[in-house]
Amino acid sequence: MTVRVGINGFGRIGRNVFRAAATRGADLEIVAVNDLGDVATMAHLLAYDSILGRFPEEVTAEPGAIRAGDTTVKVLAERDPAALPWGDLGVDVVIESTGIFTDAAKARAHVDGGAKKVIIAAPASNEDVTVVLGVNQDAYDPERHTIISNASCTTNCLGVLAKVLHDAVGIESGMMTTVHAYTQDQNLQDAPHKDLRRARAAGLNIVPTSSGAAKAIGLVLPELQGRLDAFALRVPVPTGSVTDLTVTASRSTTVEEVKEAYAKAAAGAYKGLLSYTEAPIVSTDIAGDPASCVFDAELTRVLGSQVKVVGWYDNEWGYSNRLIDLALLVGDTL
């Protein structure tokens, strides 16, 4: 069965999802995009991407549509999700990537428009379930769950990083820092913002800010509820982020044992979600990597009961690939 997908919001994540769907060859079709921008601008930003480069096929704007290669995708411009013709278009799953409709009550308007399921591309509130692939995908119940959150890019990285470590040596407590690429929520120049640190110029500063990943981890790994805390450091790079997780382990271990646990996981049950590297990589090496987490083996440290592990992630491309994977999982159960 080909899963028919609608995208609501054609910003960074929406366009990354579109590109991932076009280049992966998965059994998934982007049927329509809803965004209030003009079609010519949307097509241009899809064709020319400052991080991913040129779209692999020719992209053109047509009346009410974008043509990418041999595929024509309908473009809608509707403010009210309930008014979208998802049912008429035969859409199975809507990927909600505006960043606006993150409450389940608002996201459910897509169902009123005829969609069967909605995946929120962000941490959500009042959702039926939050799913991080590789961690708790078995929690998804197609009979009970209609509004699904894919959590955040950081939670997808942290979830995999923490689960492998917890399964191997146990986690009593821990602290996570994500050194994160700047995002559209920050300012290019100093300007008012509700977070006074994010008010400062993103390209000139290391910006400490909050991260909900530690709290969200309890949604997908209930056994770690309340055991982790976290914050973020936004840095002047456009993509390529890294999670530093330091924990108190439940038992003694060694660097070698920890590395072996991740190597086995990456080659086995977590293949495609977790990658393992011993190369001395930096953030630009992660751009375009589809994994949720790239484990940096050479940064592993053990000191007494303290264990430090580090995982890289392309906060846009990796996350967008998980949205595709989750849409396939959800679609296969319809």
Curated annotation (Swiss-Prot):
SMART domains: Gp_dh_N. It holds the Pfam family Gp_dh_N. It comes from the Bacteria. One of its GO terms (biological process) is glucose metabolic process. The record marks 180 as: Activates thiol group during catalysis. InterPro entries: GlycerAld/Erythrose_P_DH, GlycerAld_3-P_DH_AS, GlycerAld_3-P_DH_cat, GlycerAld_3-P_DH_NAD(P)-bd, Glyceraldehyde-3-P_DH_1, NAD(P)-bd_dom_sf. NCBIfam families: GAPDH-I. PANTHER family: GLYCERALDEHYDE-3-PHOSPHATE DEHYDROGENASE 2. This is Glyceraldehyde-3-phosphate dehydrogenase 1. It comes from Streptomyces avermitilis (strain ATCC 31267 / DSM 46492 / JCM 5070 / NBRC 14893 / NCIMB 12804 / NRRL 8165 / MA-4680).
